[in-house]
Amino acid sequence: MKPDHIPFQELTDETLCRLAASGDRVAEERLVMRYNRLVRMCARPYFLAGGDSEDLIQEGMVGLLAAIREYDSSKAAVFRTYAEVCIKNRLFS
């Protein structure tokens, strides 16, 4: 559990993932806000002329949410690396 006196912005990604996995929606929202720019950066190369860029961004967000829910901090990857892989995999599929 998150101690009440620690602001969310001071928590690590790994701690926020653990909180989100236990049902803490605020922790999940914080991670989505923290990684919004990464999603947009990953989606940018796939924008097509005449296509809807928001559709790609939404697919990337689905990948980010999957990363938040499935991240296992006992593995060797830090969250950002895992999130980027999940986002790109979602964009490719």
Regions found by a protein language model. Name each.
Residues 1-93:
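Alpha-helical promoter-recognition and RNA polymerase-docking modules of transcription initiation factors
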